[in-house]
């Protein structure tokens, strides 16, 4: 029951934001390609600039499954970092451990990736890490604990069930061994998230 409720909530959020947050939500959106609620099919009035920026910020947050406080901290770090703030923001979020567990194909959704980390199934350079927000460094190896490899979710993952069609070039993935190495810092153009990051910057700079 809880899983069904969570799936419906995710599908509703996906429709509201206009992006599929999970594979199941993608199928749901194919059947109902309009916003949620009784007025979902109606043509929407022109959104205000604030509403457009807010929605873009919410889209980015939802794709990484993070809280507002985490998003704000990441933005402040991105703002202090040399380069374009919006690109920095996405690149920093992508270096989170849960994001890379998802991108490597160890999990089906960001929520599952976070759960795998919290339950101490994931290791970085041979050390168990249970913080989804852990920042993975260049050259570090992400892998599944040997005692966890035999569990059904990881057997499914090792068979390639969740592997992306195009694995980002910043990851060297050996899915059969349930290993992935962050070979370098991600570039915004390579990160498979849907976001106009400049609108997110404008939201926080208001």
Swiss-Prot record:
Domain named S4 RNA-binding: residues: 95-160
Any matching Pfam family: Ribosomal_S4
Domain of life of the source: Bacteria
GO molecular function: rRNA binding; structural constituent of ribosome
CDD domains to which the protein is assigned, alphabetical: S4
Function: One of the primary rRNA binding proteins, it binds directly to 16S rRNA where it nucleates assembly of the body of the 30S subunit.
The family this protein is said to belong to: Belongs to the universal ribosomal protein uS4 family.
Keyword Electron transport among record annotations: no
Biological process, per Gene Ontology: ribosomal small subunit biogenesis; translation
InterPro entries recorded: Ribosomal_uS4, Ribosomal_uS4_bac-type, Ribosomal_uS4_CS, Ribosomal_uS4_N, S4_RNA-bd, S4_RNA-bd_sf
Residues covered by region (Disordered): 28-48
Name by which UniProt lists this protein: Small ribosomal subunit protein uS4
The entry's keywords: Ribonucleoprotein, Ribosomal protein, RNA-binding, rRNA-binding
Range of residues in the leader sequence: none
Assembly information from the UniProt record: Part of the 30S ribosomal subunit. Contacts protein S5. The interaction surface between S4 and S5 is involved in control of translational fidelity.
Annotated Gene Ontology cellular component terms: small ribosomal subunit
């Amino acid at each position: 029951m809880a899983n069904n409720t969570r799936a419906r909530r995710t599908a509703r959020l996906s429709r509201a934001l206009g992006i599929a947050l999970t594979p199941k939500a993608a199928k749901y959106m194919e059947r109902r390609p309009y916003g949620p609620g009784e007025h979902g099919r109606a043509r929407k009035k022109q959104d205000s600039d604030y509403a457009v920026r807010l929605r873009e910020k919410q889209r980015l947050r939802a794709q990484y499954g993070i809280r507002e406080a985490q998003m704000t901290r990441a933005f402040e770090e991105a703002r202090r970092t040399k380069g374009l703030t919006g690109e920095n923001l996405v690149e920093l979020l992508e270096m989170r451990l849960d994001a890379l567990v998802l991108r490597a194909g160890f999990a089906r959704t960001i929520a599952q990736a976070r759960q795998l980390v919290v339950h101490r199934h994931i290791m970085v350079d041979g050390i168990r890490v249970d913080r989804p927000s852990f920042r993975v460094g260049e050259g570090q190896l992400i892998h599944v604990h040997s005692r966890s490899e035999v569990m059904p979710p990881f057997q499914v993952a090792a068979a390639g069930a969740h592997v992306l069609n195009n694995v980002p070039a910043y990851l060297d993935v050996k899915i059969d061994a349930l290993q992935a190495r962050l070979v370098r810092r991600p570039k915004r153009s390579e990160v498979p998230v849907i976001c106009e990051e400049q609108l997110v910057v404008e939201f926080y700079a208001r």
